[in-house]
Amino acid sequence: MSYSCCLPSLGCRTSCSSRPCVPPSCHGYTLPGACNIPANVSNCNWFCEGSFNGSEKETMQFLNDRLASYLEKVRQLERDNAELEKLIQERSQQQEPLLCPSYQSYFKTIEELQQKILCAKAENARLVVNIDNAKLASDDFRSKYQTEQSLRLLVESDINSIRRILDELTLCKSDLESQVESLREELICLKKNHEEEVNTLRSQLGDRLNVEVDTAPTVDLNQVLNETRSQYEALVEINRREVEQWFATQTEELNKQVVSSSEQLQSCQAEIIELRRTVNALEIELQAQHNLRDSLENTLTESEAHYSSQLSQVQSLITNVESQLAEIRCDLERQNQEYQVLLDVRARLECEINTYRSLLESEDCKLPCNPCATTNASGNSCGPCGTSQKGCCN
C-alpha cells in the first residue's frame, strides 16, 4: 500500500482578509495513520508574530517527528516492494526459457511412453485372450479325450459282459448237448435192451413152438413182435417228445432271460452313457466357469492395480495441491496481517491528521479578522491583499 504526502508551502496566505497568517507547523497534511497524542495538547493561542507557547510547540514537534518517521517507513516499504517485484520478474524471466522446452520434451516423452504402454497393454490383452482360447481348446480336447476314453472303457466292459454271457450260453449249450447225447445214449441203450429182450423172447418162443408144434395151434410171432415194437416205439416217441418239449421250454426260457437281460443291459448302458455325457458336459462347463473366474480375477487384479496407481497419483496430486493451498493460505494470512498493520497505521495517521485539523481550526477561530501587523527581521509587514507579503509567516 503506497501513501502520498502533499506538504504545503511555507509562504504567506494570498488573502489576509479571509485567513490570517499561520505558522508552517500548523498546516494540515493528507496522510493515513494514527498516533498516540500526548495529553498536554491544548488550543493554540495565536499571536501576530505567528509563535506558540511551549507545550503547543512540543506537541506539534512530536507529531511532526512521528509523521516523518511514518513517511520514512512507508517509503522504505515501497522501495522494498519495488525491489522484490523486480527480483521476482527477473527470476521468472530467467526461469521461463529454461522450463518451457524441458516441459515440452517431457510431455512428448510422456505421450510416447503412454502410447507404448497402451500398445503393450493391447498386445498383452491379445496374448491373454489367445492363451485363454488355447487353454479352452486344450480343455475341450482333454474333455473329449476323457469322454472317448470313458466310452472305450464302457464298450470294453460291455464286450466283457457280453463275452461272459456268451460263455454262459456256450456252457448252457454244451450242457444241453451233453444232456441230448445222454438221452440219445439212453435211447440207444433202450433200443439195445429192447432188441435183446425181443431176441430172447424170440428164442424162447421158437423153442416152445418147436416143442408144441404138434400139440397147439401156431401163434403169429411177427404180430406179437410188431405190437411190442409199436409199444416200445410209442414209448420212445413219448419220451423223445417230452425231452424235446423240455429242451424247447428251457431254451425259450433261457432266450427270454437273455433277451430281457440284454435289454436291461442296453438300457443300463444307455443310461450310463447318458450320465457320463452329462458328467463330462458338466465338467467341461465347470472348467469353463473356472477359467472364466480366473480370467475375471486376473482382470480384477489388473484393474485394482491400475486404479490403485491412478489413486496414488491423484492422492499425490491432491497432496501437492493441498500443500500449495496451505502455502497460499499462509501468504494470504501474512498479507492480511500486513494489510491489517497498514490499516492500523493508516487509522493512527488519520487520527493524527484529524488532531492537526482540529488544532488548526481551533486556532483559526481564535485569530482576529484583521490581518496581523507584525514586522519581520527585514522590516516588511503582512498587510491586506495587494500589499507586499515577502516576510509574512516565515
UniProtKB/Swiss-Prot annotation:
Pfam families: Filament. The record marks A305 as: Stutter. Residues 1-56 are annotated as: Head. GO terms for biological process: epidermis development; epithelial cell differentiation; intermediate filament organization. One of its GO terms (molecular function) is structural molecule activity. Residues 103-203 are annotated as: Coil 1B. Residues 220-363 are annotated as: Coil 2. Residues 56-367 form the IF rod domain. SMART domains: Filament (SM01391). Residues 57-91 are annotated as: Coil 1A. Keywords: Coiled coil, Intermediate filament, Keratin. Residues 204-219 are annotated as: Linker 12. This is Keratin, type I cuticular Ha4. It comes from Homo sapiens. The gene is KRT34.
